[in-house]
Amino acid sequence: MRGLKRININAYQKSMGELIDLSGVVDYNISHHPDAINIPYQRLMLYYDHYLDKNKSYYLTCHKGIHSAKAVTMLEYLGYDVTQAVT
């Protein structure tokens, strides 16, 4: 198994794929990257096939990096093109 794909969030550009902030709604409303959409971690993990397309690239972020690391690991195993975007 490969290592976790990771970039610094400052290197993210919209043309790379969709940036998803996995924070809860309250934390997202307090602070988030201007290009990020919010899909809370638990919701994405339950309904990933509803939100994600295996033919697209995604960059996942959260405030502490724990949820985004877990999500990238699981979703990559399931065949999605996902990268952790860290601060």
Where are these regions (language model features)?
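Short, acidic/turn-prone active-site loops that include or flank metal/cofactor-
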Residues: Y41-L46, V86-T87
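Short, cationic motifs built from Arg/Lys/His that form the positively charged side of catalytic pockets
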Residues: D21-S23, Y47, H67
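Short amphipathic alpha-helix with an adjacent loop that forms part of the alpha/beta core around
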Residues: N10-Q13, L46-K54
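Conserved beta-strand scaffold positions in the cores of enzyme catalytic domains, especially
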Residues: R6, L19, A36-N38, V82-Q84
